[in-house]
Curated annotation (Swiss-Prot):
Fourteen ClpP subunits assemble into 2 heptameric rings which stack back to back to give a disk-like structure with a central cavity, resembling the structure of eukaryotic proteasomes. Its EC number is 3.4.21.92. The lineage of its organism: Bacteria, Pseudomonadati, Pseudomonadota, Alphaproteobacteria, Hyphomicrobiales. This is ATP-dependent Clp protease proteolytic subunit 2. The gene is clpP2. It catalyses: Hydrolysis of proteins to small peptides in the presence of ATP and magnesium. alpha-casein is the usual test substrate. In the absence of ATP, only oligopeptides shorter than five residues are hydrolyzed (such as succinyl-Leu-Tyr-|-NHMec, and Leu-Tyr-Leu-|-Tyr-Trp, in which cleavage of the -Tyr-|-Leu- and -Tyr-|-Trp bonds also occurs). It comes from Bradyrhizobium diazoefficiens (strain JCM 10833 / BCRC 13528 / IAM 13628 / NBRC 14792 / USDA 110). It comes from the Bacteria. It is found in: Cytoplasm.
Length: 211
């Protein structure tokens, strides 16, 4: 028998729109995708990464100039999956706005910082966490050495990406990511991960209330 809580959590709300051809039903995420809103929620892994990349490419094809909004609530996950999303965000022509709701940890924080400059936001009670990549390996000693070198290469590359998007020095980023570093929304703003902390939706983006 399936867990009723799990069943409930897997239910996706449907919304109904009136069109010239009658009623049309969408799941809530598809409806918001029509508004150029992408949800990046849960662990970052290959399946989720593929869906996010596909949505980014679809919205670029729909309109190569209009802004895309990405709402992030993620504990992080697989580095290569996150970098696939990151590279696509940089590759496509539309500017990508990012907004942290809940948390943006590990790869989630990197994707939050990767939004278009001056278009990276956080809600006031969101939490952001940055740290260096981690991994566990087993096998022959030579293979373990190769994996260790690869994770050091990834660490260096991730540090460089944070430097690019935060404006911090490499040494500052390296020191900050040495251990899990937890940040409030305002701390993340001071660190350069986001540009503004917003607590109300404004009628005009430029008029958004900031902290």
């Amino acid at each position: 028998m399936r867990d009723p809580v799990e069943t409930y959590m897997n239910l996706v709300p449907m919304v109904v729109e009136q069109t010239n051809r009658g009623e049309r039903a969408y799941d809530i995420f598809s409806r918001l995708l029509k508004e150029r809103i992408i949800f990046l929620t849960g662990p970052v892994e290959d399946g989720m990464s593929t869906l996010v990349v596909a949505q980014l490419l679809f919205l670029e094809a729909e309109n190569p100039k209009k802004e895309i909004s990405m709402y992030i609530n993620s504990p992080g996950g697989v580095v290569t999956s996150g970098l696939a999303i990151y590279d696509t965000m940089q590759f496509i022509r539309p500017p990508v706005s990012t907004l942290c709701t809940g948390q943006a940890a590990s790869m989630g924080s990197l994707l939050l910082a990767a939004g278009e400059k001056d278009m990276r936001f956080s809600l006031p009670n969101a939490r952001i966490m940055v740290h260096q990549p981690s991994g566990g390996f087993q096998g022959q000693a030579t293979d373990i050495m190769l994996h260790a070198q690869e994770i050091l290469n990834l660490k260096k590359r991730l540090n460089e990406i944070y430097v690019k998007h935060t404006g911090q020095t490499y040494k500052t980023i390296e020191d900050a990511l040495e251990r899990d570093k937890f940040l409030t929304a305002n701390d993340a703003k001071e660190f350069g991960l986001v540009d503004r902390v917003i607590d109300k939706r404004a009628e005009e983006p430029a008029a958004a209330k900031t902290q």
